[in-house]
Amino acid sequence: GSTLEQRLGRRIDRKLADLGRLAFHDTLLGLNNDNSCSGCHAANRGFGDSQSIAIGVENNNIVGPDRTGPRNQRRAPIVLNNVFYPRLMWNSRFASLSGNPFDNSGGFQFPPPESFSLSNLSHLLTAQAFIPVTENVEMAGFDPAVLALNHDGIRSVVAERLNANNEYRRLFGKSFPEVRNGAPITYEMLGRAIAEFEFTLVFADAPLDRFARGHRRGHEND
């Protein structure tokens, strides 16, 4: 298997990754239905940002250079190969203190109010998926009803939306037997699905990558 699958200790769950891909591109995760993960991490931009400073909510429903709306503080980082990084975001504010994103033994550290509360999750990317929906300028928006909610409250609203959607219940049921048997979709299940999709966004085997790893033969003319 791949280096990624060796470190995961299992094969990529393609069914779960496909579900995560759907959720990654769905504005249902934004409380005003006006932004998705892909709004700031666009596939047609190498899963990076089309803007010098990210635009999240209240946008003009365009992904690309003509996108308008309130700006965040920084450009959205690219999400390719993030599965291997022990620290995420430009200021490294999401971190696996073991130095390994696959290892939660040292805890996953986030700014308050999450702090170390997501350390029970199996990978740093699963924990990271808990954050964007709670950020007002990214996905939550500024409605007074939203501003009155804490982060867990916002995540509960997102989970309720998934549970109210028959197609999502069917798809989550394919990956989670408890959902198939009538249990509710939880936000953790969503986080696992999005992380599984991001596990597929690994691009580290170009000829230059192989050359850097010491494989010189056959690359003289590449």
Predicted regions mapped to residue ranges:
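Periplasmic c-type cytochrome electron-transfer domains
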Residues: G1-D222
